[in-house]
Amino acid sequence: MASRCWRWWGWSAWPRTRLPPAGSTPSFCHHFSTQEKTPQICVVGSGPAGFYTAQHLLKHPQAHVDIYEKQPVPFGLVRFGVAPDHPEVKNVINTFTQTAHSGRCAFWGNVEVGRDVTVPELREAYHAVVLSYGAEDHRALEIPGEELPGVCSARAFVGWYNGLPENQELEPDLSCDTAVILGQGNVALDVARILLTPPEHLERTDITKAALGVLRQSRVKTVWLVGRRGPLQVAFTIKELREMIQLPGARPILDPVDFLGLQDKIKEVPRPRKRLTELLLRTATEKPGPAEAARQASASRAWGLRFFRSPQQVLPSPDGRRAAGVRLAVTRLEGVDEATRAVPTGDMEDLPCGLVLSSIGYKSRPVDPSVPFDSKLGVIPNVEGRVMDVPGLYCSGWVKRGPTGVIATTMTDSFLTGQMLLQDLKAGLLPSGPRPGYAAIQALLSSRGVRPVSFSDWEKLDAEEVARGQGTGKPREKLVDPQEMLRLLGH
C-alpha cells in the first residue's frame, strides 16, 4: 500500500508538497482503513457542479457529503441563470433533489464560505473539500463610459429577472427604443429574447413579478447583438438561434454582405457549426415564404446581429447622465481556425441606443486567501480537479475550467473531479483518522450568529413559492429577499 501511495504522490497535482523521508510510511497511508470507514467530504456551492460532484462522491458506500451554499436556496444557475421560458432545462433539479434526500448528504444554505467560515476551517473539519462555487462575476468591458447609467452586465440582468437577491435593485430602464448587447453567446440571446418576447408569453413562467411588471412597460423595439468576429465564430447554439428567428412579433435583421463567401467555407467545419451557419445564411439571404414574410411584415419588434464590430466606448447623452450609444471599431479577421482573431481596420461607427448590456463572459472570484487563484484566467489552478499544491482540496465546474459549456459539460467535469477524489481516498492520500465534519462547522457558525438553512427548510420555501404562483397560473412566484426567507423559516 505504501509503495502505491508513494508512486502516485510523485506524479500528483501537488508536486511541491514536502515528501515523507525515505523509508518511512506516510500517516495517511498507514491509517487508510480508518479513513475509509466514514470519509467526511464537503462541497462548496449547490449549483450543477456542486450537486453532480456530490452525486458521484456518494458512490462511495460510507461517504458523507455536506453541501454549503451562500444563498438560502439551492441549485445555483439552474435557478438563477436558466431563462424562465426554458423550464425543461430546470428538470435537473429533480435529480439534485434525489441527491439531497440521501441519508449521507446534507445541504446547508445561508452559509458564505470565505465570510462565515474559512476554507482552512473546512479543511480541518473534513477529509476533503471540493470548491464548486461557479462564476459569480462578469468580465468587464474596460472601455470608457462603462460606468454610465444605462450600462449593466447581462449577468446582472439575468439575475434580476430570475430573482437573484443581489440583483433585485438593478431597476433597468427600458424606456428607450434600442438596446445593444455586446456579445453573441447563448446568454446574449437569452437576454435579447426576454427583452423582445411579448410579456403575456412570460406570464406563466417563473420570471419574477417585479421583472414582468417592468417588461410590460418596456419600450424597447430593437435589439442589436454585437460581436468582434464573424458568423462562423458566434458562440450561441442552433436551438437558441431558432427560437430567436421564430420569436412572435419580432423579425431578424441580418446583412447579406456579412455572409459573402461563407457557403464554401462551411463545407469543412464540424456538423453542429455547419448547421448553425447554414441557418444564419438562409435567414440572411433567402427570401422568406409567404407566411413567414407576412409574419415579419406585421412584427413590431426586431433583432439583429452586427458582426466585425468591437466596442471602444459607451457614448454619453448630451447631459452626460446616461448611455446614449456605443462607438464600435470595424474589424477584420486574421488567422485561421482557432487562431482567428479580430483586428481593427481603423474605421469607426456609432450605434445609438439607450441600454447597453455587456455579455462577454462570466468570471470566478477567489473565495479565500488560502486557495490558489489564477486571476488572469479566473480559475483555481488544478490538474483534473486536484488543486495545485494543496492536498485534500479539489474543484469542479466553472471555477475549475472557466465559464464555458452547458449543464451536461459540467456533469462530466464534476464526475471526473469526484472520481479523482475517490481514487485519492482509496490510495490513502487524504488525511487520516476521523474528522468531525458538520458538527465542528455548526459550532463555529453558531458562535458567529449564522443560522444555516437545511434542505427540508428549502422544501418549505419551495412549497411557499409554488403556493404563491398558483393564484396567477405561474409554476412558482420566487422569493427574492433572503430576510423574508429566513423569517418564513423562523430563523
From Swiss-Prot:
Q: Which residues hold FAD?
A: 49, 69, 77, 113, 398, 405-407
Any Pfam family from its record, for instance, is NAD_binding_8
- Location(s), subcellular: Mitochondrion; Mitochondrion inner membrane
Effect the entry attributes to changing residue 74 to L: In MMDS9B; uncertain significance
Instruction: Relate the outcome reported for changing residue 437 to C.
Output: In MMDS9B; uncertain significance
Q: State which Enzyme Commission number(s) the record gives.
A: 1.18.1.6, 1.18.1.-
Top EC class of this enzyme: oxidoreductase
Cross-referenced SUPFAM superfamilies, in alphabetical order? FAD/NAD(P)-binding domain (SSF51905), Nucleotide-binding domain (SSF51971)
Q: Where do the annotations place NADP(+) binding? A: 184-187, 228-229, 240, 405
Instruction: Describe which pathway this protein belongs to, using the record's wording.
Output: Steroid metabolism; cholesterol metabolism
The organelle targeting sequence, given as a residue range: 1-32
From what superkingdom does this record's organism come? Eukaryota
Q: What is its main location?
A: mitochondrion
Stated consequence of mutating residue 386 to W? In MMDS9B; likely pathogenic; decreased NADPH-adrenodoxin reductase activity
The answer to whether UniProt assigns keyword Zinc-finger to this entry is no
The entry's stated outcome for residue 155 to W is:
In MMDS9B; uncertain significance
Sites where Phosphoserine occurs are at 310, 317
Which regions form coiled coils? none
Instruction: Identify the InterPro entries for this entry.
Output: FAD/NAD-bd_sf, Ferredox_Rdtase, Ferredox_Rdtase_adrenod
The entry's stated outcome for residue 205 to A is: In MMDS9B; uncertain significance
Its GO biological process annotations read: cholesterol metabolic process; generation of precursor metabolites and energy; steroid biosynthetic process; ubiquinone biosynthetic process
* UniProtKB keywords: Cholesterol metabolism, Deafness, Disease variant, Electron transport, FAD, Flavoprotein, Lipid metabolism, Membrane, Mitochondrion, Mitochondrion inner membrane, NADP, Neurodegeneration, Neuropathy, Oxidoreductase, Phosphoprotein, Steroid metabolism, Sterol metabolism, Transit peptide, Transport
According to the record's subunit comment, the protein's assembly and interactions are:
Monomer. Interacts directly with FDX1.
Which family is this sequence assigned to? Belongs to the ferredoxin--NADP reductase type 1 family.
Q: What does the record give as the function of this protein? A: Also acts as a ferredoxin--NADP(+) reductase essential for coenzyme Q biosynthesis: together with FDX2, transfers the electrons required for the hydroxylation reaction performed by COQ6.
Stated name of the protein: NADPH:adrenodoxin oxidoreductase, mitochondrial
Q: Name the gene that codes for it.
A: FDXR
